[in-house]
């Protein structure tokens, strides 16, 4: 049996995608709509309060295209906290006008494919901790997609030796390093949590960088032979102070 990769696991992750029911929201009187949006704003302020204690983070984005209008990405130390947050959101009046279109449950993950040998506790390494328990960059643009490692009769990632996988992941990672300073990447593991094995969340100031890195990686052996992908979601940051304008009709 091939050796399984070990992982370092950080905060639990929940991507929530919603479409806005604009026809129904249009029937709401302006005064009521303003109160509904303010209640949503207060909810987001409460989510943000954990940042000061470094107990999680969240990001809010306006998704481009018809797959969704809004993405709320939440990170917390415990999965149960994600349940509580989603429940609280569902109880808000704004939820009457938000139609769930997709969600993704996972956990911030680092693998040991590229790790060197050390007796150090990785969870005490400041660089590792910053990646497992991140402060999100809130860049202008976001891209999210789920993915699997292919396993079929021709190409099966899980039948490769650890050495083969390490070599492939090293080459794969070298492409990613070319985009340092242009793209911030977060990998979340979802085996046993959701329909795919990983989620990939990218942040950038220029959305064209998403196209460039994904296209370049198509020619990498790790992706070309062993990568299967779900839907891609891309969007622009939705500052909370602009919510009233966003929901105004």
Curated annotation (Swiss-Prot):
E.C. number: 1.3.98.5
Family: Belongs to the ChdC family. Type 1 subfamily.
Keywords: Heme, Heme biosynthesis, Iron, Metal-binding, Oxidoreductase
Gene Ontology MF term list: heme binding; metal ion binding; oxidoreductase activity, acting on the CH-CH group of donors, oxygen as acceptor; peroxidase activity
Protein's name in the database: Coproheme decarboxylase
Domain of life: Bacteria
Active site per the UniProt annotation: 145
Cofactor: Fe-coproporphyrin III
PANTHER family: COPROHEME DECARBOXYLASE, HEME-DEPENDENT PEROXIDASE YWFI-RELATED
NCBIfam families per record: PRK12276.1
Reactions that this protein is recorded to catalyse: Fe-coproporphyrin III + 2 H2O2 + 2 H(+) = heme b + 2 CO2 + 4 H2O; Fe-coproporphyrin III + H2O2 + H(+) = harderoheme III + CO2 + 2 H2O; harderoheme III + H2O2 + H(+) = heme b + CO2 + 2 H2O
Cofactor note: Fe-coproporphyrin III acts both as a substrate and a redox cofactor.
Residues bound to Fe-coproporphyrin III: 131, 145-149, 172, 185
Gene3D superfamilies referenced in this protein's UniProt entry, alphabetically: Apc35880, domain 1
A Pfam family assignment: Chlor_dismutase
Coiled-coil intervals, chain numbering: none
Cystine bridges: none
GO biological process: heme B biosynthetic process
């Amino acid at each position: 049996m091939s050796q399984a990769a070990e992982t370092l696991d950080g905060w639990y992750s929940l991507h929530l995608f919603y479409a806005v029911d604009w026809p129904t929201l249009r029937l709401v009187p302006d005064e009521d709509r303003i109160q509904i949006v303010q209640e949503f704003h207060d909810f987001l302020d409460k989510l943000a309060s954990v940042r000061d204690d470094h107990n999680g983070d969240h990001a809010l984005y306006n998704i481009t295209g018809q797959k969704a209008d809004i993405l709320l990405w939440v990170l917390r130390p415990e999965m149960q906290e994600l349940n509580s947050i989603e429940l609280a959101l569902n109880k808000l009046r704004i939820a009457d006008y938000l139609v769930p279109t997709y969600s993704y449950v996972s956990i911030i993950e680092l693998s040991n494919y590229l790790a060197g040998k050390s007796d150090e506790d990785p969870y005490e390494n400041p660089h590792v901790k910053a990646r497992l328990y991140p402060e999100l960059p809130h860049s202008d643009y976001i891209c999210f997609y789920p993915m699997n490692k292919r396993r079929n009769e021709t190409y099966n990632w899980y039948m490769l030796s650890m050495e083969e996988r390490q070599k492939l992941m090293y080459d794969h990672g070298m492409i990613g390093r070319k985009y340092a300073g242009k793209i911030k990447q977060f990998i979340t593991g979802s085996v046993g949590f959701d329909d795919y094995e990983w989620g990939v969340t990218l942040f950038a100031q220029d959305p064209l960088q998403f196209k460039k890195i994904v296209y370049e990686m198509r020619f990498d052996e790790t992706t070309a032979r062993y990568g299967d992908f779900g839907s891609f979601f891309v969007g622009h940051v939705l500052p909370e102070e602009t919510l009233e304008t966003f929901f105004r009709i």
